[in-house]
Amino acid sequence: MADSTGLQFTVKVGALPENTFVVAEFALDEALNRPFNLRLELASAQPDIDFGAVLDQPCELLVWYNGELQRRVCGVVSDFAQGDSGFRRTRYQLRVLPALWRLSLRQNSRIFQAQKPDEILSILLQEHGITDYAFALKNEHAKREYCVQYRESDLDFVNRLAAEEGMFYFHEFEAGKHRIVFADDAAALTQGPELFFNLGNRSLEQGPYVRQFHYREAVRPSDVELKDYSFKTPAYGLSHKKVGAELTHQRDTYQHFDFPGRYKEDPSGKAFAQHRLDALRNDAVAGQAKSNCAALLPGQSFSLTEHPNGSLNTDWQIVRIQHTGLQPQALEEEGGSGPTVYHNEFGVVKASTTWRARIGSPEAPHKPMVDGPQIAIVVGPDGEEIYCDEHGRVKLQFPWDRYGSSNDQSSCWVRVSQGWAGGQYGMMAIPRIGHEVIVSFLEGDPDQPIVTGRTYHATNRPPYELPANKTRTVLRTETHQGEGFNELRFEDQVGQEEIYIHGQKDLNVLIENDAAWHIKHDEHTDVDNERVTRIKANDHLTVEGEKRDQIKADYSLTVDTSMHQKLGDSWLTQAGQEVHVKAGAKVVLEAGSEITVKVGGCFIKVDGGGVTLVGPTIKMNSGGSPSSGSGWGGKSPVDPLGVSVPPKPKVPLTPAQLATMKSAAPFCEECEKCKEGGCEI
């Protein structure tokens, strides 16, 4: 029942009867980007109220004036305590928070991909059963390719993400429920009451008023410049600057510069620079006031009138407010007396100012930083062994990501550090699916992973057993979609030093100039099939010992001009069937002492003593005919397959595009004239 002031406070908790509690006093703190906090001091005729009927149950506080509802606050009971008991009344204390508070009870690590900020916020709210929320967004918010919640509560993540995107939120109340509203511009504010400035001691009957208003200006950063880097446009600065308004009372040289700006594209960079400036200057022009209007709440503006300083008679928006109410009649046994009173204190900024939370403040915690490198597993779609994009990036599954499915959707494309990386030269070794990698994070940012190392584990073992082969340095690959491997191995054990090369199929070597081999001991070559060699100029071979050749089939030798052989001692040739020597003009056999031609028991011998013919019958110009030989039937060698020069990778950008990337000009696809170098632009 209202007292002489006309004020009354009532409370309803869960399914308990409405007369279970009476309100002795309350304190309500509200602010943009913060869950409200309502503390209630209650009294009840029941000394044994069931805690289960109160805790985590809905609670609604109503503020009445002359029987008319002025304000309601609905939330969830987070704390309940029983105090002193008397003959008639027992005291209780309640703490009431919004449903959004439940997000503070769950800490998580997870990855969101290719989703807009409002979509991410909706997912988190719905997972906690919150469906009464709204987005009053004026600006476009780009999809986040990769957004990580890392070892932070859902509420901290919501506050941080909203602040990064320049959003703020507040609560609206209806009978038995409350709504969370996310906005990104002051235009989303609702228009509240008109409050006059009470110079005298006018009462509440004359309407709600402001009884104190302190105006303040503060020197804050004058402008913001953010800069970032993208490997896709390495020469482009990605720098964006925004200058503040209302700088007439301070210098304009207080620049806030930061790198990285946490963006990769110009539209986001422009927006983030403006968000940062708004946040840094969110109290450059502000006020602190006191009033008796219970209807005031964050997310609302009001009009101030009748202030002696006419410049203050304008619209203001409330960014935080503390309500206090006392109803001493509720404490009958303690002799509670005095009128029911209510007042509030609140902070304001101009209604035209878009208030944004400052990163690092209670309303917007800093992004968690990863304390060091982490382990991850390379993943990809089913049936693939190697999965990458045109930049050699891979997908990863982090051990802490409970939502990932160890497939090509588990992460964004993650860059991989290589031992050397230049303009179409360097090293390239793609981590394969199932490999364990070491992941670092640029600036400790969980949104910017990069693979910086590789490690073996219990199932991915080294190529050779250790420590038995600890002196071996090995580079071994594995055949893709098959069995086999290529290997380059170095053995450093003293007395066993070795360089070993294994190719599962082919070996191709291309030397653009000279190749020199110096083998100080033996060389052994074993070719299981054919060996084909072509020398386009001269071939010189010097054997300082003996040379042995064994050919188990035919041997063909073709010399296009002359063949010269010089033997220091003997020339001994043995044929199993036939020796056929044929010359186009002449055959000359010359010996220093003797030439003998022998067939069976017959022979011709020519020496210094004369010519000797021996045989059963000697025929001169009579009988018989000459025999013919088999003739030359040799085969020409086949040409080697050869080794082709690998083609250079296609140049991804034309000179015109490269020049554009080095400037601040917008970047677009090239036209056909650009490809031919004839574009006027």
From Swiss-Prot:
GO terms for cellular component: extracellular region. It catalyses: L-arginyl-[protein] + NAD(+) = N(omega)-(ADP-D-ribosyl)-L-arginyl-[protein] + nicotinamide + H(+). Gene3D superfamilies: 2.30.110.50, 4.10.220.110, Baseplate protein-like domains, Gp5 N-terminal domain. Part of the type VI secretion system specialized secretion system, which delivers several virulence factors in both prokaryotic and eukaryotic cells during infection. Acts directly as an secreted effector with an actin ADP-ribosyltransferase activity that disrupts the host actin cytoskeleton, leading to a decrease in host cell viability and an increase in apoptosis. Belongs to the VgrG protein family. NCBIfam families: vgr_GE, VI_Rhs_Vgr. This is Type VI secretion system spike protein VgrG1.
